Design a protein with these regions (language model features):
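N-terminal Rossmann NAD(P)H-binding glycine-rich loop of SDR-like oxidoreductase domains
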Residues: 2, 6-26
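NAD(P)H-binding glycine-rich loop region in Rossmannoid oxidoreductase-like domains
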Residues: 39, 51-93
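Active-site YXXXK catalytic motif of short-chain dehydrogenase/reductase
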Residues: 91, 144-148
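Conserved Rossmann-fold NAD(P)-dependent oxidoreductase catalytic core, especially the SDR/UDP-sugar
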Residues: 96-143
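NAD(P)-dependent short-chain dehydrogenase/reductase
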Residues: 123-124, 153-204, 209-210, 247
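Substrate-binding strand-loop-helix patch
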Residues: 175-179, 201-213, 229-247, 285, ...
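Mid/C-terminal beta-alpha module of Rossmann-like enzyme folds, strongest
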Residues: 191, 215-264
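Conserved C-terminal active-site "lid" loop/helix of NAD(P)H-dependent oxidoreductases
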Residues: 209, 239-245, 259-296, 300-307
């Protein structure tokens, strides 16, 4: 576990960064920057011992933020839709400004996404790091995959230009008590809403927040010039239909699921984890256990089925 470091995390209160922030704040000097539109979330981050600053990544006006960080974790992302110009500014340009500002760091982790891969007609295809990139073609957020491809290009340039070791981690379907696609489906079931996956089956490489946090240190250790690019996702592919059925069984409801195809869109988001396994080792949490734990954290007492 990293200790005694000075670490900057963007978006520390978010569903992806929260577990990382909790873990790293135990033995390091951690700073967190974000817009912090939710004051309560900022207080929760500061309660971990994290020093915060209100900084909008659309402008990257850093004010009195120090520069002497030993590690940068750029995790914040914009999921706004409709404007590619805005999406590229907030996701891609901000990565460049962050890496330039922290160019003296030992290493940086840039969080990308499996959504950068060009869709294939095979739902269970496991994308490898060298596969073709392209627009995932989902309607919301419609700009995301293109903006993240741009972000990767900026990060690759910065690694070489600044001689700064960088890892670009293409994150799978991350989830935890603060959110994620499985949790969106859980809330839909609780509210009696229809869940509309775009294909059947619609597989993902889901990964829980605890595994994400545990793998940050080795991913930073793998940072290099040129940048290391690696899929950062769960070991066990699982279809949305599978986790919906599993969670429905735990909470005792009948889910409403209706497939709603999206022409041209990706029909699966599974990542090949061979490269990541060589860096981090295997995940510790099976998807069933991870989802059960998250439901218990988010809705105590909701689960009707005893742990087997």
């Amino acid at each position: 576990m990293l200790s005694g470091e000075k670490i900057l995390i963007t978006g520390p209160a978010g569903r992806i960064a929260w577990h990382i922030t909790q873990k790293l704040a135990q033995k390091n000097e951690v700073w967190g920057i974000a817009r912090f539109g939710n004051l309560q979330e900022r207080r929760e981050v500061e309660a971990l011992g994290v020093t915060t600053r209100h900084i909008d990544l659309a402008t990257c006006e850093f004010g009195d933020l120090p520069r002497d960080f030993t590690y940068l974790l750029h995790i914040a992302a914009s999921f706004e839709h409709g404007s590619y110009d805005r999406a590229i500014q907030v996701n891609a340009e901000s990565a460049g400004f962050m890496l330039e500002y922290c160019r003296s760091a030992k290493a940086a982790l840039i969080m990308s996404t499996l959504s950068v891969y060009k869709p294939t007609p095979a739902p269970w295809h496991a994308f490898k790091e060298g596969d073709a990139l392209g627009d995932i073609m989902v309607p919301i957020p419609d700009t995301y995959s293109i903006a993240k491809i741009c972000e990767e290009a900026v990060a690759r340039f910065c690694a070489r230009s600044f001689n700064l070791p960088v890892t670009i981690a293409r994150l799978g379907a991350a989830y935890g008590p603060r959110g994620g696609l499985p949790l969106m489906h859980l809330e839909a079931m609780l509210e009696g809403r229809v869940i509309e996956p775009r294909w059947d089956p619609l597989p993902y490489s889901a990964i829980p927040g605890d595994d994400i946090a545990d793998m940050v240190e080795p991913l930073l250790g793998a940072a290099s010039v040129p940048a290391t690019i690696v899929n950062f996702c769960g070991d066990e592919p699982v279809a949305a239909q599978q986790w919906i059925a599993y969670m429905a069984g735990l909470i005792g409801v009948t889910p409403k699921v209706m497939v709603k195809p999206v022409p041209g869109a990706s029909v699966g988001s599974v990542g090949d984890v061979t490269k990541r396994l060589g860096i981090t080792g295997p995940c510790k949490i099976k998807w069933q256990d991870g989802l059960r734990r998250v439901i218990e954290e988010r809705h105590p007492g909701l689960i009707k089925v005893p742990f087997a």
